[in-house]
Amino acid sequence: MTAIQLIVGLGNPGPEYEQTRHNAGALFVERLASAQRVSLTADKKYFGLTAKFSHQGNDVRLLIPTTYMNRSGQSVAALANFFRIKPEAILVAHDELDLPPGVAKLKRGGGHGGHNGLRDIIAQLGNQNDFHRLRLGIGHPGDAKLVSNFVLGRAPRAEQEKLDASIDFALGVLPDVLAGDFAKAMRELHSQKA
């Protein structure tokens, strides 16, 4: 079991993107930082907002890239390479079109599924895709042509409340994730109902 050393929350920078569906991963990391009572601060060296906390004697680093989504890998690779963090010790939280709002799932490895942030992370990590993902459901607009405006839009209140609940569920299983007990975390998280 590999303990998680880096948790990344994907999103786009700037106030115009705050609270958009595409920033679900960044919202997760913001909530995690708050729960751990640490402040995310800008760090130009890693092209993002960073923080650190300790869990069972191990450092866990938080990162929200401040590059745009399609350049997220630049930020992740800079921090991971500097601290010699292997892909299997990274958890990337991101929005997921293929899951309904209120559903969160953990996954290890796999492709990018059309997600530009994941695509760039895989490329910047030398085509290694063996990192863990926290997939936060945002739903799908029903037509591929509508996806861009959908993910860059704000969710209606009922949808946002479901996303918030899925983030709470994910935060609840985080101790198991941090310890590397993904089987237990997945059982608990995947049994939650939206």
UniProtKB/Swiss-Prot annotation:
Task: Tell me which residues bind tRNA.
Answer: Y17, Y68, N70, N116
Provide one Gene Ontology biological process annotation. Answer: rescue of stalled ribosome
> What is annotated about its quaternary structure and interactions?
Monomer.
What's the catalysed reaction?
an N-acyl-L-alpha-aminoacyl-tRNA + H2O = an N-acyl-L-amino acid + a tRNA + H(+)
Q: List the disulfide bonds.
A: none
The UniProt entry, under HAMAP family, shows: Pept_tRNA_hydro_bact
- A single Gene Ontology molecular function, please? peptidyl-tRNA hydrolase activity
Q: Which residues form the active site?
A: H22 (proton acceptor)
Q: Locate the site labelled Discriminates between blocked and unblocked aminoacyl-tRNA.
A: N12
Instruction: Output the InterPro entries linked to this UniProt entry.
Output: Pept_tRNA_hydro, Pept_tRNA_hydro_CS, Pept_tRNA_hydro_sf
Q: Which GO cellular component terms are attached?
A: cytoplasm
Where does the entry annotate site (Stabilizes the basic form of H active site to accept a proton)? D95
Enumerate the UniProt keywords alphabetically: Cytoplasm, Hydrolase, RNA-binding, tRNA-binding
* Function text: Hydrolyzes ribosome-free peptidyl-tRNAs (with 1 or more amino acids incorporated), which drop off the ribosome during protein synthesis, or as a result of ribosome stalling. Catalyzes the release of premature peptidyl moieties from peptidyl-tRNA molecules trapped in stalled 50S ribosomal subunits, and thus maintains levels of free tRNAs and 50S ribosomes.
What gene is it encoded by?
pth
This chain's protein is named Peptidyl-tRNA hydrolase
Q: Does the keyword RNA-binding apply?
A: yes
What's the Enzyme Commission number for this chain?
3.1.1.29
Q: Where is this chain's protein located in or outside the cell?
A: Cytoplasm
SUPFAM superfamilies membership: Peptidyl-tRNA hydrolase-like (SSF53178)
Q: Which family does it belong to?
A: Belongs to the PTH family.
